[in-house]
Amino acid sequence: MEFKVILPILGFEQIEKYKLEKIDDVFFKLEGGDISFTLINPFSIKPDYDVIISDADKEKLNIKDDSNILVLNNMIVATPLQNSTINFASPIIFNFDDNIMGQVILENAQNYSLTDPLANYIKGE
């Protein structure tokens, strides 16, 4: 599904549209131009993840109480996979009702890391 960028991904402000592809219940692929990101469903590994979005960002992304949204986090994939890191402080929010998206900095970002190791949430083999 294609989404129009309302709040750009930091460092990639020139990209105006992205295509989101579900890989499985945990991982997603986000493509725009020549750029590709691996995204992760934060609730699959951190059920207590608390997403507090500013009123200004909610307005820009047209988020209401009944909006069909998806929250995903950017992941830097490494080998082995346990060495990958996740940005929990600034998730990417997808509004499926309006096909718009944006990266936000959480109101409670101080509670989260930009580079939280995946190893903190999965068991090694």
Listing of model-derived features with the role each one plays in the protein:
Residues 55-65:
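Short active-site loop/helix that positions an aromatic residue
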Residues 1-48, 66-125:
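Long, compositionally biased stretches
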Residues 52:
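Short aromatic/basic micro-patch
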